[in-house]
């Protein structure tokens, strides 16, 4: 019975993530999607769950014809703080400052997502500027 229960949970997990992303894309008229490349060195179970969610997110974006951009943690830190080895708190403080927030976003995943968005905005602006020089 356990394998069927496990498949049932995965089915609902995938369905929930897909529908949620699909709704966000449609309700907020999202043009592009930026995600962080996976990096896990400790908890394999967490890595698998995050990888599954990430795949579903990418599928939902693809079905909605939204380009997906990936950034490494080093690129995110470089794009937000200007230093690829910045500490998490430095990144959070810079995100708070750049977005004119009253306090550091919580939980940490929210702050990370905003940092990825800021990184992408900077990278996108640079890419457009470089295209204008051609």
Model feature map: region roles:
Residues 1-134:
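Phosphate- and other anionic-substrate recognition elements at nucleic-acid/protein interfaces
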């Amino acid at each position: 019975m356990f394998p069927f229960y496990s498949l049932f949970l995965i089915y609902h997990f995938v369905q929930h993530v897909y529908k949620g992303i699909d709704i966000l894309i449609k309700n907020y008229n999202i043009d592009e999607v930026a995600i962080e490349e996976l990096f896990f060195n400790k908890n394999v179970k967490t890595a698998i769950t995050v990888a599954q969610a990430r795949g579903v997110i990418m599928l939902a974006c693809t079905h909605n014809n939204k380009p997906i951009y990936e950034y490494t943690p080093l690129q995110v830190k470089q794009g937000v703080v200007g230093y690829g080895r910045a500490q998490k708190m430095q990144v959070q403080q810079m995100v708070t400052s750049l977005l004119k927030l009253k306090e550091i976003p919580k939980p940490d995943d929210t702050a990370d997502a905003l940092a990825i968005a800021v990184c992408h905005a900077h990278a996108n602006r640079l890419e457009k500027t470089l295209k204008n020089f051609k």
